[in-house]
């Protein structure tokens, strides 16, 4: 469930951009595909829904023995929900990361080469989940 039950009788055009995005994701789940190709599935969603949507996607992949190839521009989402990250630039492939098994000290140099000086740290949520947080260090402060 993507949380749109109360809008089930509404026309697609009546939904907000975020609700449309969730509706399209739900349609993808119903098709039970084993390979999902998703271009920024969280793009029209607010902060909370971005994380919930990526959690739904990760659960779908696990329960359906599926794989998802997802483009994301938010490194925090990628670091917390993707098993493998291919870090790209206009010049091509910069590197590959495995956030759940690679030590933070090995990920920071590659991410710093893209975003400038950053540091990674872990945070525990109220639900006891671990989150990897990327902090951009401002050289002007």
What are these regions (language model features)?
Residues 1-7:
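Conserved ABC ATPase "signature" region
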Residues 11-15:
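Conserved ABC ATPase signature
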Residues 36-40:
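Catalytic Walker B motif of ABC-type/P-loop ATPase nucleotide-binding domains
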Residues 51-63:
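Helical segment within the ABC ATPase nucleotide-binding domain
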Residues 72-73:
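H-loop/switch region of ABC-family ATPase nucleotide-binding domains
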Residues 88-117:
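Conserved beta-strand-loop-alpha-helix hinge in the C-terminal portion
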